[in-house]
Regions:
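Composition-driven recognition of long, C-terminal low-complexity regions enriched in serine/threonine
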Residues: 1-6, 26-29, 169, 190-198, ...
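N-terminal secretory signal peptides that target proteins for export/translocation
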Residues: 1-17
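Bacterial N-terminal signal peptides
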Residues: 16-29
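Sec/Tat signal peptide C-region and signal peptidase I cleavage site
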Residues: 32-36
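Thiol-based oxidoreductase modules, predominantly thioredoxin-like and allied folds used
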Residues: 134-185, 208-227
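Short, thiol/selenol-centered motifs that function as redox-active sites or metal-ligating centers
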Residues: 117-128, 135-137, 173-198
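Active-site/pore-lining binding-face segments in mid-to-C-terminal subdomains
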Residues: 202-273
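Non-globular targeting/processing and membrane-anchoring segments
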Residues: 37-168, 251-385
Length: 385
């Protein structure tokens, strides 16, 4: 993403409540796993996501059957088919490349950490489809799926237009633009990241088992909502989405949190980084992140990632190269290095540019990744230990 403001992370509970919170998360995961194994899924949520994706869901829900007969849906299907076709070819290239280049031991028992993610489920799932747990965090509110029960034809047409607006950049560029998202994800019909992530799940032929709000710090939330309380710039909001493949495969869980990850704002949620660190060793995805981890205001978040990760896929906007040059990290470079785009020149890394120049015949990157998405100008780095 391109950021105009600082990005984010998440939380849990204090002192003696920590173990209780962890037990609750484990219990929820076990319950969701049992539901997935029994072939259960939320038909309304899955069908709603399919409609937003331009996919006709199975008939049988009168509230939705009426909508897929409208001309607005036919137009939306045509647009999504065209634009998703382009994005799907990119995803296929990522999947093919991943099969050859990405080797993660024990992937089916690992967590993917995606800092500054926005609603970008597509890249997370394309690179790390075997991970059972995903932790996303960024500034955008989670929101909810739209309710299609009583939407009018006119409202439905506006909703689908909002979906197209929200997907335009990720389909074309393979990243979101923060300034645009502040408008795209706050319309009367598309609110927050949940509608976008759910739509992406439908496009990837996944089924939604449940979507539930999560508040890992209810006591803090209550105290910050009090009048005259000293509070963070943004209250942390969370959501958990359980999903599985269409054939009823293993359960996956996605935790998304909206919170500012700058050091001074994380002071309002002091245990969050410890909670994230409990998922070590984690895989990490960083892309189009406005070089936030180069900024001294994000030192705590950067330190947590470096101590918790054992496998990182990123572009040059992620962890500064100087940290990954050090033992015990091993680095592989792909594609090309280009200086940062206009407005982000402070992210230039002479050492990374030199590393690219020092290696001849670096493997090409067969898909766009990061801000240099036009042509074959993208670069990607894999670091593991």
């Amino acid at each position: 993403m391109i950021f105009s403001a600082h990005r984010s992370i998440v939380v849990i509970v204090e002192g003696s409540l920590r173990s209780l919170a962890l037990a609750l998360v484990v219990a929820i995961a076990l319950a969701g796993s049992a539901a997935a194994e029994n072939g259960e899924f939320n038909r309304r949520a899955t069908a709603t996501a399919q409609i937003l994706a331009g996919i006709t869901p199975p008939a049988g829900d009168p509230a939705l059957d009426r909508l897929v007969k409208l001309e607005a849906f036919a137009e939306h299907q045509k647009w999504m088919a065209s634009h998703w076709g382009q994005a799907r070819s990119r995803i296929s290239a990522i999947e093919s490349w991943r099969g050859q280049q990405v080797k993660i031991s024990g992937a089916n028992n690992k967590t993917l950490l995606y800092p500054f993610s926005g609603p970008d489920f597509l890249n997370a799932y394309a690179f790390f489809p075997d991970h059972p747990l995903y932790i996303f965090f960024s500034l955008e509110r989670p929101g909810t799926l739209p309710d299609l029960e009583s939407v009018t034809p006119a409202q439905f047409g506006k909703m689908l237009q909002d979906v197209r607006n929200a997907f335009r950049d990720i389909f074309e560029r393979n990243y979101f633009i923060t300034d645009y998202m502040s408008k795209q994800l706050t319309t009367p019909w598309i609110r927050g990241t949940v509608p976008v992530m759910a739509t992406m799940m439908a496009l990837m032929n996944l089924r939604i088992i449940r979507i539930e709000p999560i508040d890992l710090y209810p006591e803090l939330t209550n105290s910050y909502e009090a009048l005259e309380a000293k509070r963070p710039r943004r209250l942390m909001l969370g959501v958990r989405i359980d999903f599985s493949s269409a054939n009823g495969g293993p359960l996956h869980q996605l935790y998304y949190f909206s919170v500012d990850a700058a050091d001074k704002w994380l002071e309002f949620y002091p245990d969050f980084l410890d909670w994230v660190a409990q998922h070590r060793p984690a895989s990490v995805l960083l892309k189009s992140a406005s070089y936030l981890l180069h900024d001294s205001q994000f030192e705590k978040t950067r330190a947590m990632i470096l101590s918790s990760a054992d496998y990182v896929i990123q572009d040059d906007t992620g962890i500064p190269y100087r940290f990954l040059q050090q033992s015990p990290w091993r680095v592989r470079l792909y594609g090309r290095y280009h200086k940062p785009i206009k407005g982000l020149r402070y992210g230039y890394q002479a050492d990374l540019e030199s590393a690219y120049k020092a290696k001849s015949n670096l493997p090409e990157l067969p898909f766009p990744f990061g801000y240099h998405w036009r042509g074959k100008r993208s670069g990607l780095l894999i670091a593991n230990r």
